[in-house]
Curated annotation (Swiss-Prot):
It comes from the Eukaryota. It comes from Homo sapiens. Residues 193-284 form the Ig-like C2-type domain. Changing residue 453 to C: In a gastric cancer. InterPro entries: ConA-like_dom_sf, FN3_dom, FN3_sf, Ig-like_dom, Ig-like_dom_sf, Ig-like_fold, MAM_dom, Prot-tyrosine_phosphatase-like. The gene is PTPRT. Expressed in colon, lung, heart and testis, as well as in fetal and adult brain. Not detected in muscle and peripheral blood leukocytes. This is Receptor-type tyrosine-protein phosphatase T. Substrate binds at residues 1052, 1084-1090, 1128. GO terms for cellular component: cell surface; membrane; plasma membrane. GO terms for molecular function: alpha-actinin binding; alpha-catenin binding; beta-catenin binding; cadherin binding; delta-catenin binding; gamma-catenin binding; protein homodimerization activity; protein phosphatase binding.
């Protein structure tokens, strides 16, 4: 019964479970339906753990009681009672299918409780390799019957594979897992995607390997795709691209491959219908190649290396498709590679002297195929020449004995070698010998050269060198700073002693160490032959300029030894002193003054006189002598007035035999005459061997008293006439011849006296009539006399036994000088009250002495028709010549040679024509300046210039044309060759629109050929400019100083109105030109007219000074013999005369600042005899030379329409000085009563005007605005009676015509009210506004000619100076006004100019300044009190320092 039941159940189940679809279909080898034993299909099972294994079940043959077991014939595992994870394997036979095919099977999961019985995994093992991970699996709940699954397998011959079914149990989950109907189909699966052939992937080590899995089938988002490694490691895949609806692809990468990455990989996909498995593809990892040996070095250069790569022996895989060289510096981090395509390779563009590391890189195919660099070749390139020498080399510190250089720091980029040297080479010339030296520099960018010589021109350069070469910097030429100089050579000090003077000269120090600027000489008396001499004050100090290596010390005490300590100075200070001693000669005793020559008592045979002791001078009085001289008829009164001392003793007894007119009546010892006492001449006594016989009653006598001093072999004598005694009157009728002679002498004396009185009276009257001033004329007369007396002074010093020289007078070639009486037989120095006539002023660095030249014979031949003119007759002569009655300037000028008078063949040569500005003003052959010939140019010796003789100075001048562009270099060659220290320029660069001269001087430094010219200083003055240069020639260490005197006030046409400015210019040139310098170079445009005027004036001033005469005609004639047409027009010829006349009338009135205080008291002291002073004489001369104003000179002010604009018609502004108004004010004219005035420094610096009238206030403010006036100085009080009312706004603003004046501020400082206004032209607002200060000086009462306080007026001047410095840059003008624009305004302008002169030139010349002001306005400084006041303010100004 039981068996029947089972059978029935089995049948029932068969009926319930439908058969497997296609269960009995035919399949390829490897399939199995399990109807027979599975081994018949080639299947096998592997016994699992604890007997867990696959069993073949055939329920048809053996039914199963458990309903969970399906019916049929199949393979199954029973997981009941199994531990979790137990596995059972069913192995299919090995298959060798080629290409893609399908394996499908059915599986069945069942359990009683419907829980999962476990898992079913399917493995595809290829070529007997590892099992790996399952390609398909299922787990979970039981299935609802048999479920079909597909395996799409892609394999390719000769590979084979084996499918393994694995059952995995789950603990506590009993059930059954069955597999049935396994088929191997020769076509792709219906549902499961299949893969195309997976290709092998070859990569290089370290690269990412990418596998691309291409599947056929339909992609579903639920499909799972992965890459399965041979050893079973899975990597998920992502579909990257769907090709079409039946094909898709996915990629996966194996990152950072290495040899351990070498393996086989296949693609696996799991879909709802099953799994697809690709073939295994191999991942091949190649090792990039590396050379075994380093490259071989073949050759080395500075910027290249030749190498051989040595790439045949390698480590790694080939093939080698690329060879590269990698190189880098051993100290750097960068590397560079070059492709090598030849057996040897040259590395270019390397850096010199750098160590390189060179390796070879080999590359095989594929990304990352370049292997690591091979072993390195380490080598160093050679050094290369430096790129350039040191750059931007400059001197940053210059000292006397050292220089500090600085240059642009450089490194390897410049040196191109790590081993280099930096050297400084320098050379200089010392004592005409060239020295060269070099020093190695250790610092990087600066170096100090030490041990140099001061003030030395040094040429230096830096040298940068390395083993391969060297480069130099640009040459620098620098001069070390000055140092204190060495000592003046003691042996060079020479002294010429006189009585009260010592002339001392010396040579500069051997080591000047710079430009000697000053010499300081300290002197003091150290002993005297005269024990009574007070030497306490005999000391002092003088300073001499660099070009004055001599000095005449005056005011010394005779017979005294002086020590002189000399030291030189540069800009750095004084050097060591050197001391010498020189003694003055003894002087004749100083004789006392006798009020009258009337004797105390007189008889027929005696005369009693008073004897006074003499004052010793340098040596004690040795003896007194009383001399009696007989006066005879043949001696004129003039000759008798000349006192002659008696050096040869003659006794009364010897006088007759020697026919001597004099005899010694007595000789007294100094002890015998201690005090004043009477002495009777003719007392018939003997004194020290000399008989004093009675006098003859019939003779006339002169009684002389003389004193002698003897010391050191010298004998000096001085004498005085004590009395005269006439012959006695006889009562007999017979007249003795001696009486007659004596009476004749007396009568002649009386007549001569009367004649002299009449002549003097007529001279005074003539002087007044001609308005000449004796003081002015006497300047040149006295200078001439001084020269003669100085020349003859040496003859008058007596030796021990020399006879007394008689005074001599050297006569001029054209007239006789008057004789001068002298009370001393030895005249070594001329002393006069005039300050311009001191023997030689003691100089400091600020003084301005004017040198004189030694008088010699006249250098110009005197024509008998044009004789030289005495200075005293010059005014009369010029007046007569200007009248032109019969013979005047016109005829005299026409008598001069005109045009060419000598050959000028050289100037006419074709090669020299372009060197001449004008074809008719060229150089004579005989006097032309010949330049040194330049190499290769025989015509380079020509320049249009001629030597011109001066007064006793051959070739003292060079007259030349103004340089042209082609001749500038030649001009400077001439300056250097001739050693000229002064250039006089009497033209402007452009006149009337025409170029008269090219600018041939630099603003800073310029090189003309081989001459380097550097501007040092510019001193602008009102009428001329002084520029100071240093001049240096290439190859010479000498640096010379040169001054260019540029006279800027010569008008474009004609001549200057007055010679005042030109005379000051001439004196300045004369003073500043060193005596040892070469010719003064003078030029205008052509080098004829103005040039000749300057030379003629300078020459004639020298003649007037030395001889008291002038010879202008013959001077010009001689000038024209040396250069054509010097003094070119009659107008210039007359101007030369006028200039000389003004110089003679006015004299030289300049006073050095250092002497002003002492001289001022002398010139202001009243002479009791004349009741005058030199200042008064100056002012009288000033009135004489002040130009008379003619009506035609002030024609504009005289126009009727301008009458009401003038306070007075007496003094009107000159037409040429008028400031015409520019701003338009209705119908008002452009006239204002004002004049432009020069200051000392600035032309037209002042605008002098009257106090504005009510109808001219607008004109006044137009003047202020139009002429850029920054200051207004008001010097008068407001007075309504005089129509002097306020013309400015107070606290507000006001309009005056077109000018708006706005009050800004005001303050009061003692006597000064200081206001500030802002003004603008309302008609031209675009011009902006200007700031103007208004200085109202209230300290000058109306009733006084001068203000009571000099200090307060100086405060106005200082306020004006300060304002100009701070606000207008000294460019604005100053309006100065008083009531009439005359005396007060002129006084203020003169004071301002004097202050400027003191500051700029250290001299005071009040006369010159006032004369300059009066040339433009005749009422400037109206009274003597105002003129004196200017002097007094100058003294006050000096006291403020």
């Amino acid at each position: 019964m039981a068996s029947l039941a089972a059978l029935a159940l089995s049948l029932l189940l068969r009926l319930q479970l439908p058969p497997l679809p296609g269960a009995r279909a035919q399949s390829a080898a490897g399939g199995c339906s399990f109807d027979e034993h599975y081994s018949n299909c080639g299947y096998s099972v592997a016994l699992g753990t604890n007997g867990f294994t696959w069993e073949q079940i055939n329920t048809w043959e053996k039914p199963m009681l458990d309903q969970a077991v399906p019916t049929g014939s199949f393979m199954m595992v029973n997981s009941s009672g199994r531990a979790s994870g137990q596995k059972a394997h069913l192995l299919l036979p090995t298959l060798k299918e080629n290409d893609t095919h399908c394996i499908d099977f059915h599986y069945y999961f069942s359990s009683r409780d419907r829980s999962s019985p476990g898992a079913l995994n399917v493995y595809v093992k290829v070529n007997g390799g590892p099992q790996g991970n399952p390609v398909w699996n299922v787990s979970g709940v039981v299935t609802e019957g048999w479920v079909k699954a597909e395996l799409a397998i892609s394999t390719f011959w000769p590979h084979f594979y084996q499918v393994i079914f694995e059952s995995v149990s789950l603990k506590g989950h009993p059930g059954y897992i069955a597999v049935d109907e396994v088929r191997v189909l020769a076509h792709p699966c219906r549902k499961a995607p299949h893969f195309l052939r997976l290709q092998n992937v070859e990569v290089n080590v370290g690269q990412n390997a990418t596998f691309q899995c291409i599947a056929g089938g339909k992609w579903s988002q639920h499909d799972k795709l992965w890459l399965q490694q041979w050893n079973g490691r899975d990597t998920a895949l992502m579909v990257t691209r769907v090709v079409n609806h039946r094909r898709f692809s996915a990629t996966v990468s194996v990152a950072d491959t290495a040899q351990r990455s070498v393996s086989k990989y296949r693609c696996v996909i799991r879909s709802d219908g099953g799994s697809g498995v690709s073939n295994y593809a191999e991942l091949i990892v190649k090792e990039p190649p590396t050379p075994i040996a380093p490259p071989e070095l073949l050759a080395v250069g500075a910027t290249y290396l030749w190498i051989k790569p040595n790439a045949n022996s390698i480590i790694g895989d080939g093939p080698i498709i690329l060879k590269e060289v990698e190189y880098r510096t051993t100290t750097g981090t960068w590397a560079e590679t070059h492709i090598v395509d030849s057996p040897n390779y040259k590395l270019w563009h390397l850096d010199p002297d750098v160590e390189y590391e060179i390796r070879v890189l080999l590359t095989r195919p594929g990304e990352g195929g370049t292997g690591p660099p091979g072993p390195p070749l380490t080598t160093r390139t050679k050094c290369a020449d430096p790129v350039h020498g040191p750059q931007n080399v400059e001197i940053v510190d210059i000292r006397a004995r050292q220089l500090t250089l600085q240059w642009e720091p450089f490194g390897y980029a410049v040196t191109r070698c790590h081993s280099y040297n930096l050297t400084v080479q320098y050379q200089y010339v010392f004592n005409q010998q060239q020295y060269e030296a070099e020093e190695v520099i250790q610092t990087s960018s600066h170096y100090t050269l030490r041990g140099l010589r001061p003030f030395m021109t040094i040429r230096l350069r830096l040298l940068l060198s390395n083993p391969e070469g060297r480069m130099e910097s640009e040459e620098l030429v620098v001069q070390t700073e000055e140092d204190v100089p060495g000592a003046v050579p003691l042996e060079s000090i020479q002294g010429g002693p006189f009585e009260e003077k010592i002339y001392i000269q010396w040579k500069p120090p051997n080591e000047t160490n710079g430009v000697i600027t000053l010499y300081e000489i300290n002197y003091k008396a150290v002993g005297s032959l005269d024990p009574s001499a007070d030497l306490s004050s005999q000391r002092g100090k003088v300073f001499k300029l660099r070009n004055e290596t001599h000095h005449l010390f005056v005011g010394l005490y005779p017979g005294t030894t002086y020590s002189f300590t000399i030291k030189a100075s540069t800009a750095k200070g004084f050097g060591p002193p050197v001391t010498t001693r020189i003694a003055t000669k003894i002087s004749a005793p100083s004789m006392p003054e006798y009020d009258t020559d009337t004797p105390l008592n007189e008889t027929d045979t005696t005369i009693t006189v008073m004897l006074k002791p003499a004052q010793s001078r340098g040596a004690p009085v040795s003896v007194y002598q009383l001399v009696v001289k007989e006066e005879r008829l043949q001696k004129s009164r003039r000759a008798a007035d000349i006192i002659e001392c008696f050096s040869v003793p003659v006794s009364y007894r010897n006088a007759s035999s020697l026919d001597s007119l004099h005899y010694f009546a007595a000789e007294l010892k100094p002890a015998n005459l201690p005090v004043t006492q009477p002495f009777t001449v003719g007392d018939n006594k003997t004194y020290n061997g000399y008989w004093n016989p009675p006098l003859s009653p019939l003779k006339s006598y002169s009684i002389y008293f003389q004193a002698l001093s003897k010391a050191n072999g010298e004998t000096k004598i001085n004498c005085v006439r004590l009395a005269t005694k006439g012959a006695s009157t006889q009562n007999s009728n017979t007249v003795e011849p001696e009486k007659q002679v004596d009476n004749t002498v007396k009568m002649a004396g009386v007549i001569a006296g009367l004649l002299m009185f009449i002549i003097i009276l007529l001279g005074v009257m003539l002087t007044i009539k001609r308005r000449r001033n004796a003081y002015s004329y006497s300047y040149y007369l006295k200078l001439a006399k001084k020269q003669k007396e100085t020349q003859s002074g040496a003859q008058r010093e007596m030796g021990p036994v020399a006879s007394a020289d008689k005074p001599t007078t050297k006569l001029s070639a054209s007239r006789n000088d008057e004789g001068f009486s002298s009370s001393s037989q030895d005249v070594n120095g001329f002393t006069d009250g005039s300050r311009g006539e001191l023997s030689q002023p003691t100089l400091t660095i600020q003084t301005h002495p004017y040198r004189t030249c030694d008088p010699v014979e006249m250098s110009y031949p005197r024509d008998q028709f044009q004789p030289a003119i005495r200075v005293a007759d010059l005014l009369q002569h010029i007046t007569q010549m200007k009248r032109g009655q019969g013979y005047g300037f016109k005829e005299e000028y026409e008598a001069l040679p005109e045009g060419q008078t000598a050959s000028w063949d050289t100037a006419k040569e074709d090669e020299n024509r372009n060197k001449n500005r004008y074809g008719n003003i060229i150089s004579y052959d005989h006097s032309r300046v010949r330049l040194l010939v330049l190499d290769g140019d025989p015509h380079s010796d020509y320049i249009n210039a001629n030597y011109i003789d001066g007064y006793h100075r051959p070739r003292h001048y060079i007259a030349t044309q103004g340089p042209m562009q082609e001749t500038v270099k030649d001009f400077w060659r001439m300056i250097w060759q001739e050693n000229s220290a002064s250039i006089v320029m009497v033209t402007n660069l452009v006149e009337v629109g025409r170029v008269k001269c090219v600018r041939y001087w630099p603003d800073d430094t310029e090189v003309y050929g081989d001459i380097k010219v550097t501007l040092i200083e510019t001193e602008p003055l009102a009428e001329y400019v002084i520029r100071t240069f240093t001049v240096q020639k290439k190859g010479y260490h000498e640096i010379r100083e040169l001054r260019l005197f540029h006279f800027t006030s010569w008008p474009d046409h004609g001549v200057p109105c007055y010679a005042t400015g030109l005379l000051g210019f001439v004196r300045q040139v004369k003073f500043l030109n060193p005596p040892e310098a070469g010719p003064i170079v003078v030029h205008c445009s052509a080098g004829a007219g103005r040039t000749g005027c300057f030379i003629a004036i300078d020459t004639m001033l020298d003649m007037a000074e030395n001889e008291g005469v002038v010879d202008i005609f013959n001077c010009v004639r001689e000038l024209r013999a040396q250069r054509v047409n010097l003094v070119q027009t009659e107008e210039q010829y007359v101007f030369v005369h006028d200039a000389i006349l003004e110089a003679c009338l006015c004299g030289n009135t300049a006073i050095p600042v250092c002497e002003f205080r002492s001289l001022y008291y002398n010139i202001s002291r009243l002479d009791p005899q004349t009741n005058s002073s030199q200042i008064k004489d100056e002012f009288q001369t000033l009135n004489i030379v002040t130009p008379r104003v003619r009506p035609e000179d002030c024609s504009i002010g005289l126009l009727p329409r301008n009458h009401d604009k003038n306070r007075s018609m007496d003094v009107l502004p000159l037409d040429r000085c008028l400031p015409f108004l520019i701003s338009v004010d209705g119908e008002s004219s452009n006239y204002i009563n004002a004049a432009l005035m020069d200051s000392h420094k600035q032309p037209a610096a002042f605008v002098v005007t009257q106090h504005p009238l009510p109808n001219t206030v607008a004109d006044f403010w137009r003047l202020v605005f139009d002429y850029n006036c920054s200051s207004v100085v008001m010097l008068n009080e407001m007075d309504t009676a005089q129509f002097c009312m306020q013309y400015w706004p107070e606290k507000t603003s006001g309009c005056y015509g077109p000018i708006q004046v706005e009050f800004v501020s005001a303050d009061i400082d003692e006597d000064i009210i200081h206001r500030i206004f802002r003004i603008c032209n309302m008609a031209r607002p675009q011009d902006g506004y200007r700031i103007v200060q208004h200085l109202q000086y209230i300290g000058w009462p109306a009733y006084r000619d001068t203000p009571p306080s000099k200090r307060s007026l100086l405060k106005v001047v200082r306020r004006l100076e300060k304002w100009q410095e701070q606000y207008d840059g000294r460019e604005g003008r100053t309006v100065v006004h008083c009531l009439n624009g005359g005396g007060r305004s002129g006084t203020f302008c003169a004071i301002c100019s004097v202050c400027e002169m003191i500051q700029q030139q250290n001299i005071i010349d009040v006369f010159h300044i006032v004369k300059t002001l009066r040339n433009n306005k005749s009422n400037m400084v109206e009274t003597l009190e105002q003129y004196k006041f200017v002097y007094e303010v100058a003294l006050e100004y000096l006291s403020s320092f």
